[in-house]
């Protein structure tokens, strides 16, 4: 930087930090005052922090109604109407309870933790994540299969709270308004109906460990992800304010329900499904689930009692998968179209291509979860070549591309110009 000086060659200094014009990149002059670029940046940081502190308080005053929550879910999640309604009411009641922590009549409101039952790829995680994003609250996921009781090899249940804190930069107040989704909860079912002499540290033991956390306790978490140490000060997190959503496929649960209600079908999510009638039967059977069925499946009564809100999700059919590919705000085809648009290229999926992708996902039995990997595979080669290819203005994917019988159709600017001239 050249040695610029003020009037009369006098060296100028920042009126706030005292640094000279040679120690900073820019010095802005005002009436009898100067401010450097570093002080301006510091002021911006302070203002941003203050806005962050104010925003959550403003958000707390504007609790969306169940209708508004449901409408937002409709924008991102296809189908599952009953589950959406159940979730919208439960989430609304949970945050209404936090907002009115001290009811005038002294009635203590219980927690509305949620249990979601449905096959892989039916939208359990997406529902919880979409609500958290809409409500602007921290969200974290945990896999129940990795959890063990404290003192055993594996992940301690309190690590879930640590992950939630990490999502909000260890702001305890924000974390206490967060949502935790615990997946594969059916995998920690009790291994047998009878208590075993051998300790079940990854099944019933984990259920016992999760009980207090889900119901509400003050969890002691090391700050900034440090290891637990006797002399270390812990962050105290009240989990009674955190909404817990547990989800699982519960393969075979319909057989337990059928035994109770004497309905003789007995086909599970894990088994081969042979027809639309069978699929409907499974979904209808799961709608009849009672707490006693979950106990027989392997969840302990105390654990079920901590999850009072129950919602079942149906297996997605071809029509739903096609909708998921193209209709939601963040639909997979829209995401890839946005990527191609960054290369100034239009991406088009023909209707027969969408049907073929849905059929492939059904064959793999991955539900909506497998759609992205299928589309990634279809577009891999073209995404590799496109940045090095000139003049391409449009890429078209049809059924033959999905089946691997041909490559995507490329339309070049010269072709379009020739077509326009011919017309």
Curated annotation (Swiss-Prot):
Cellular component GO terms held in the UniProt record: HslUV protease complex
Q: Which gene encodes it?
A: clpX
Binding of ATP: at which residues? Answer: 119-126
Binding residues for Zn(2+): 14, 17, 36, 39
According to UniProt, the name of this protein is ATP-dependent Clp protease ATP-binding subunit ClpX
Domain (ClpX-type ZB): residue spans on this chain: 2-55
Recorded source organism is Shewanella piezotolerans (strain WP3 / JCM 13877)
Similarity field: Belongs to the ClpX chaperone family.
* Keyword 4Fe-4S included in the entry's annotation: no
Q: What does this protein do?
A: ATP-dependent specificity component of the Clp protease. It directs the protease to specific substrates. Can perform chaperone functions in the absence of ClpP.
Name the Pfam families on file.
AAA_2 (PF07724), ClpB_D2-small (PF10431), zf-C4_ClpX (PF06689)
Taxonomic superkingdom: Bacteria
Keyword terms, alphabetized: ATP-binding, Chaperone, Metal-binding, Nucleotide-binding, Zinc
Molecular function, one GO term: protein dimerization activity
HAMAP family in the record, alphabetically? ClpX (MF_00175)
Instruction: Tell me the subunit arrangement.
Output: Component of the ClpX-ClpP complex. Forms a hexameric ring that, in the presence of ATP, binds to fourteen ClpP subunits assembled into a disk-like structure with a central cavity, resembling the structure of eukaryotic proteasomes.
Set out the biological process GO terms recorded for this chain's protein.
cell division; proteolysis involved in protein catabolic process
């Amino acid at each position: 930087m050249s040695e610029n000086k003020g009037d009369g060659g006098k060296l100028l200094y920042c009126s706030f930090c005292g640094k000279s014009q040679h120690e900073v990149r820019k010095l802005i002059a005002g009436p009898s005052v100067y401010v450097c670029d570093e002080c301006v940046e510091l002021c911006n940081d302070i203002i941003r922090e203050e806005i962050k502190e104010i925003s959550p308080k403003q958000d707390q005053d504007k609790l969306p109604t169940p209708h508004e929550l449901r409408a937002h879910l409709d924008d991102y999640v296809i189908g599952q109407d009953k589950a959406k309604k159940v979730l919208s009411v439960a989430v609304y009641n949970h945050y209404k309870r936090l907002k009115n922590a001290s009811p005038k009549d002294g009635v203590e409101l219980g927690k509305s933790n949620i249990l979601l039952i449905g096959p892989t790829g039916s939208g359990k995680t997406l529902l919880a994540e979409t609500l958290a994003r809409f409500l602007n609250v921290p969200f974290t996921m945990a896999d129940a299969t990795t959890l063990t009781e404290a003192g055993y090899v594996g992940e301690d249940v309190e690590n879930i709270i640590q992950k939630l804190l990490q999502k909000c930069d260890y702001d305890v107040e924000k974390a206490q308004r967060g949502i935790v989704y615990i997946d594969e909860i059916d995998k920690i079912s009790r291994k047998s109906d009878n208590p075993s002499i051998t300790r079940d540290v990854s099944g019933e033991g984990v259920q016992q460990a999760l009980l207090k956390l889900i119901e509400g306790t003050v969890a002691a978490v090391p700050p900034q992800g440090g290891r637990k140490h006797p002399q270390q000060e812990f962050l105290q997190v009240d989990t009674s304010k955190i909404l817990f959503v547990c989800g699982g496929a519960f393969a075979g649960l319909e057989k337990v329900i059928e035994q109770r209600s004497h309905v003789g079908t007995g086909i599970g999510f894990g088994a081969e499904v042979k027809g639309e009638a069978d699929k409907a039967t499974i979904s209808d059977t799961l709608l009849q689930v009672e707490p006693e069925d979950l106990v027989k499946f392997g969840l302990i009564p105390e654990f079920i009692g901590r999850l009072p809100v129950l919602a079942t999700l149906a297996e997605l059919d071809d029509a739903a998968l096609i909708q998921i590919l193209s209709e939601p705000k963040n639909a997979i085809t829209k995401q890839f179209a946005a990527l191609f648009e960054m290369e100034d290229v239009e991406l088009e999926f023909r209707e027969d291509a969408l049907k073929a992708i849905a059929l492939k996902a059904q064959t793999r039995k991955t539900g909506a979860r497998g759609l992205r990997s299928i589309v990634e595979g279809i577009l891999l080669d073209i995404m590799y070549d496109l940045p090095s290819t000139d003049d391409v203005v449009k890429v078209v994917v049809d059924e033959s591309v999905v089946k691997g019988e041909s490559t995507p159709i490329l339309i070049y600017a010269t072709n379009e110009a020739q077509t326009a001239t011919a017309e």
